[in-house]
C-alpha cells in the first residue's frame, strides 16, 4: 500500500471536449454537458489533498441542503405558468429537471448509471450499460458534411489561430493560463507554456484550421479555443486514422453564452471535412462509454513544498523531517549508460517503442518523424533518456513531460512543477530501476512531484517507489468506434 504520509490526491473533474456534431438536433441540454464552466479538457490529475478543504465542503453541502429544503417545498406546490411564454415554461422545466438529477458531472460508474444521457443517446457511442463484443464504427462515414461554419452568438467570430505568430501564441497562452482547468478547490490552475503548446498542437500532420479560436468582433480579443491533432491509433487488431481533441477553453465571463457546445460542433465539422470520423479522448468524468479507466498516482519529490501549498499534508504521527526522509532520493541515477536522447537515437527509439506497444490494446502508431517530435528532448517540455550498453546499443528509454501549475493565493509559492510519466520501454534494464532513475532525474531538474497513470506496466512500480494513489479516475473514450472495454494495464496511450 502507499504510505499514509500523503493522502490521495484528487483529480479535477473536467467535462470533455470531443466530436459532437448533432444529428440535426443541435446541442441538446443534458446533465453531462450543461455546466459550461466545466467544459475544459484536462488529463493531469493535479489537485490538492487537504482534509480541512473536505470538511469545509461538507459544511457547505450541509448549508446547501438546509437552503434546498425551502426550494424542495416550493417544488411540491403547483406552479401557475399560464402567463409565461411557452419557451420560458420549457426553460423552467429543464432547470427543475437538471436540479433534480444534480448538475455535477458523474465521477463514478455508479453515479453515471443514475443519470440520463439525453444528448449522448443521439451520438455514435455505446450506451453505458451496453456490453460490447464487436469491433468497428458505430455509424458509417458521412458523405454529406456541412460546408459552412456553425453560427456563433452575436458579436463573436471564428479565427483559425496562427500559432507561428508569437503574438497569437501569447494570446492563447494567456487565455488558457487565466481560464483553463482549475482543481475543485480553486487552488491550482494548469500553466501550459507557449513552447509546450507548440509541442502539443503542432505535431507532424497538424492543420491550421484545427486550431479553432473564437474572438470578440469589436475588440478581437481571444475568448474561446478548441483543437484537434491527427493520430494513428491501434485499437485491438485495427489501425485507424483519428484525432485527439484538446484544450477546449471558454473565457470565464462567456460561460453563460453556450460558446463551448458550438466550439465542439465546429471542430467536429472541420475534422469530418478531412475525412476523419473517429476520435480518442480522455476525461475525468464518466460518460457513455469508457473503453478504459485509469488512475493517477503521485510521487512527492519536494514534500515540504507540497505540504506548504496544501497539495498534500502531514498525516498523524508524521513530522516534516520524517516525511522528507521517507521521500529522499539518491543524488544520481544508478543505471550505467543512462544519458539524454540524441538525434542519432531516433531510429532505435522508434523501433523499441513500436515493439513494446504491441502487447497493449490501445496504442499510438508513430513513424520516425512523430517519434522525433514527441520524444526528442526540449527543455521544460519533454525529457527522454536512453540506456546505452557497453556495446553501444540502446536497449531502454524513459520519458516524462513538464506541466507546471499556477498556485493561486499563496504568499510565497507561485508555481508547482510537475513531471508526467510518458512512455517507458525496457528490454534489459528492469522497469523498477528505470523508473527509480526517472524520479532521481526529475528531482535533479527541480520538479516538485512526479505523476503517473496506472496503465501499461506501471502498476508494477507505483507502490514500490512510494507513489500515492489519486482519488479520481481518468476515463479513455473512442468516438464512433465500438470495441470491448479493457483494463488499465492494456491501455498503451498517453495523451498530453
From Swiss-Prot:
Keywords: Acyltransferase, Cytoplasm, Membrane, Phosphoprotein, Transferase. Residues 1-82 are annotated as: Disordered. Its main location: cytoplasm. It is a peripheral membrane protein. PANTHER family: GLYCYLPEPTIDE N-TETRADECANOYLTRANSFERASE 1, N-MYRISTOYL TRANSFERASE. InterPro entries: Acyl_CoA_acyltransferase, NMT, NMT_C, NMT_CS, NMT_N. GO terms for molecular function: glycylpeptide N-tetradecanoyltransferase activity; peptidyl-lysine N6-myristoyltransferase activity. This is Glycylpeptide N-tetradecanoyltransferase 1. Belongs to the NMT family. It catalyses: N-terminal glycyl-[protein] + tetradecanoyl-CoA = N-tetradecanoylglycyl-[protein] + CoA + H(+); N-terminal glycyl-L-lysyl-[protein] + tetradecanoyl-CoA = N-terminal glycyl-(N(6)-tetradecanoyl)-L-lysyl-[protein] + CoA + H(+). The modification Phosphoserine is found at residues 31, 47, 83. Disruption phenotype: Complete embryonic lethality. Embryos die between 3.5 and 7.5 dpc. One of its GO terms (cellular component) is plasma membrane. GO terms for biological process: in utero embryonic development; ketone metabolic process; N-terminal peptidyl-glycine N-myristoylation; protein localization to membrane. It is found in: Cytoplasm; Cytoplasm, Cytosol; Membrane. Residues 55-66 have a biased composition (Basic residues). Adds a myristoyl group to the N-terminal glycine residue of certain cellular and viral proteins. Also able to mediate N-terminal lysine myristoylation of proteins: catalyzes myristoylation of ARF6 on both 'Gly-2' and 'Lys-3'. Lysine myristoylation is required to maintain ARF6 on membranes during the GTPase cycle. Required for normal embryogenesis. It is an enzyme of class 2 (transferase). CDD domains: NAT_SF. Ubiquitous. Its EC number is 2.3.1.97. Tetradecanoyl-CoA binds at residues 118-120, 247-250, 256, 258-260. It comes from the Eukaryota. Disulfide bonds: none annotated. It comes from Mus musculus (Mouse).
Amino acid at each position: 500500500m502507499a504510505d499514509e504520509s500523503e493522502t490521495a490526491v484528487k483529480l479535477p473533474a473536467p467535462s470533455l471536449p470531443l466530436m459532437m456534431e448533432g444529428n440535426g438536433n443541435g446541442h441538446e441540454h443534458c446533465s453531462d454537458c450543461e455546466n459550461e464552466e466545466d467544459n475544459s479538457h484536462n488529463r493531469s490529475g493535479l489537485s490538492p489533498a487537504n482534509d480541512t478543504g473536505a470538511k469545509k465542503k461538507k459544511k457547505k453541502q450541509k448549508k446547501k441542503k438546509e437552503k434546498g429544503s425551502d426550494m424542495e417545498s416550493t417544488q411540491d406546490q403547483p406552479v401557475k405558468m399560464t402567463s409565461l411564454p411557452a419557451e420560458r415554461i420549457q426553460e423552467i422545466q429543464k432547470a427543475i429537471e437538471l436540479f433534480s438529477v444534480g448538475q455535477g458531472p458523474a465521477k463514478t460508474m455508479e453515479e453515471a448509471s443514475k443519470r440520463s444521457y439525453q444528448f449522448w443517446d443521439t451520438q455514435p457511442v455505446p450506451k453505458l450499460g451496453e456490453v460490447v463484443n464487436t469491433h468497428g464504427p458505430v455509424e458509417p462515414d458521412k458523405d454529406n458534411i456541412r460546408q459552412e461554419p456553425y453560427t456563433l452568438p452575436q458579436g463573436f467570430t471564428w479565427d483559425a489561430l496562427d500559432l507561428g505568430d508569437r503574438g497569437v501564441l501569447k494570446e492563447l497562452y494567456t487565455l488558457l493560463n487565466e481560464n483553463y482547468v482549475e482543481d475543485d478547490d480553486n487552488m491550482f490552475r494548469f500553466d501550459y507554456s507557449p513552447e509546450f503548446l507548440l509541442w502539443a498542437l503542432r505535431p507532424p500532420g497538424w492543420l491550421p484550421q484545427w486550431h479553432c479560436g473564437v474572438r470578440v468582433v469589436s475588440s478581437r480579443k481571444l475568448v474561446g479555443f478548441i483543437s484537434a491533432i491527427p493520430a494513428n491509433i491501434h485499437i485491438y487488431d485495427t489501425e485507424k486514422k483519428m484525432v485527439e481533441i484538446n484544450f477546449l477553453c471558454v473565457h470565464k465571463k462567456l460561460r453563460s453564452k453556450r460558446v463551448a457546445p458550438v466550439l465542439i460542433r465546429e471542430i467536429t465539422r472541420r475534422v469530418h471535412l478531412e475525412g476523419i470520423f473517429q476520435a480518442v479522448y480522455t476525461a475525468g468524468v464518466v460518460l457513455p462509454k469508457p473503453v478504459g479507466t485509469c488512475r493517477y498516482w503521485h510521487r512527492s519529490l519536494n514534500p515540504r513544498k507540497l505540504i506548504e501549498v496544501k497539495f498534500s499534508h502531514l498525516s498523524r504521527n508524521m513530522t516534516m523531517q520524517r516525511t522528507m526522509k521517507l521521500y529522499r532520493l539518491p543524488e544520481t541515477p544508478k543505471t550505467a549508460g543512462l544519458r539524454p536522447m540524441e538525434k542519432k537515437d531516433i531510429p532505435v527509439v522508434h523501433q523499441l517503442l513500436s515493439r513494446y506497444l504491441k502487447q497493449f490494446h490501445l496504442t499510438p502508431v508513430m513513424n520516425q518523424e512523430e517519434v522525433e517530435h514527441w520524444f526528442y528532448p526540449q527543455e521544460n517540455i519533454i525529457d527522454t533518456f536512453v540506456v546505452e550498453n557497453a556495446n553501444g546499443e540502446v536497449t531502454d528509454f524513459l520519458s516524462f513531460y513538464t506541466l507546471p501549475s499556477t498556485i493561486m493565493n499563496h504568499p510565497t509559492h507561485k508555481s508547482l512543477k510537475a513531471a508526467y510519466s510518458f512512455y517507458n520501454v525496457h528490454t534489459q534494464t528492469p522497469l523498477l530501476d528505470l523508473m527509480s532513475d526517472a524520479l532521481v532525474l526529475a528531482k535533479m531538474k527541480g520538479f516538485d512531484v512526479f505523476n503517473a497513470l496506472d496503465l501499461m506496466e506501471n502498476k508494477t512500480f507505483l507502490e514500490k517507489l512510494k507513489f500515492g494513489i489519486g482519488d479520481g479516475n481518468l476515463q479513455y473514450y473512442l468516438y464512433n468506434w465500438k470495441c470491448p472495454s479493457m483494463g488499465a494495464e492494456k491501455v498503451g496511450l498517453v495523451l498530453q
